[in-house]
Curated annotation (Swiss-Prot):
Homodimer. It comes from the Viruses. Belongs to the baculoviridae p33 family. This is FAD-linked sulfhydryl oxidase. Pfam families: Baculo_p33. It comes from Autographa californica nuclear polyhedrosis virus. InterPro entries: Baculo_p33 (IPR007879). Keywords: Early protein, Host cytoplasm, Host nucleus, Oxidoreductase. The lineage of its organism: Viruses, Viruses incertae sedis, Naldaviricetes, Lefavirales, Baculoviridae.
Length: 259
């Protein structure tokens, strides 16, 4: 269970806004393939949102919401689409899927990535409440979500950079898949508090004992966020500010009350 901290509450609301902006892309799509891809992702996001809010995926209602978004006029401005979205979610009894704020920034995207990372960690740590196969399937879907974040980035330079470095996140999701697969065939996962990949290549024990960092994806998303913030000064050809600070793992764990 993820502790309900102010930061995690912000992440959840950003996730709802991210989901809204994703279905906004549906009405502008002119490609059948893209529409199908966006619909699949939006359906997953809203199923999960409903699971959080209603303890049920609300399959029919989410399907109606997605179909409505697909058929909405591409000429409608975002403000009008927001008004009609509020009306539609109210009509479908999906009010809890309405974001508290519609102010969309880069923070919205970062919060959503951190949120999904925490969800992955929670699914892995509580895997005994479902099944390994179920968690493995969720991880495959999560990889697609992270892979396609560039769809919603409204900065060309940011999109290009994300396309180059997103493999860092996906690589770590696949490390979790490998650990789960080992457990499936008899080698239980041992959770440790430190990041293991630096020594995994040289330490046979790390590999053979199937060790996995607890809260790995939270750590990875924090590290990735720090890297992007570091690299933007190179992209802008500017000197970093004198008092520029990076998030530390200790501070991040405190903000999220992670054990």
């Amino acid at each position: 269970m993820i502790p309900l901290t102010p930061l995690f509450s912000r992440y959840k609301d950003s996730y709802l806004l991210y989901s809204f902006r994703l279905i906004d892309l549906l009405r502008a799509s002119k490609s059948t393939h893209l529409t199908k891809l966006l619909s699949s992702q939006a359906t997953y996001l809203y199923h999960f949102a409903c699971l959080m809010k209603y303890k049920d995926i609300q399959k029919y209602e989410v399907q109606q919401l997605i179909e409505w978004a697909i058929n909405a006029s591409p000429d409608m401005d975002l403000q009008q689409f927001r008004i009609e979205f509020m009306d539609k979610t109210t009509e479908l009894n999906l009010r809890s899927c309405q974001p508290k704020s519609f102010t969309y920034t880069f923070t919205t995207i970062w919060d959503t990535m951190h949120f999904l990372s925490l969800i992955i960690d929670d699914m892995v740590y509580t895997r005994d409440k479902s099944s390994l196969d179920f968690v493995m399937q969720q991880l495959k879907t999560m990889k697609v979500l992270f892979y396609n974040v560039f769809f919603i980035l409204q900065c060309a330079m940011c999109r290009d950079h994300y396309m180059n470095v997103k493999g860092f996140i996906i690589y770590h999701i696949e490390l979790i898949e490998i650990a789960l697969d080992k457990e499936k065939y008899g080698t239980d996962i041992t959770f440790v508090d430190s990041y293991q990949q630096e020594t995994a290549g040289a330490d046979v024990a790390v590999v053979s004992n199937n060790m996995l960092m607890k809260n790995l994806m939270a750590y990875v998303s924090m590290t990735f966020h720090n890297h992007i913030n570091d690299y933007k000064w190179i992209q802008r050809n500017k000197k970093p500010p004198a008092h520029y600070e990076r998030m530390t793992w200790g501070e991040y764990k405190k903000l999220l009350n992670l054990q």
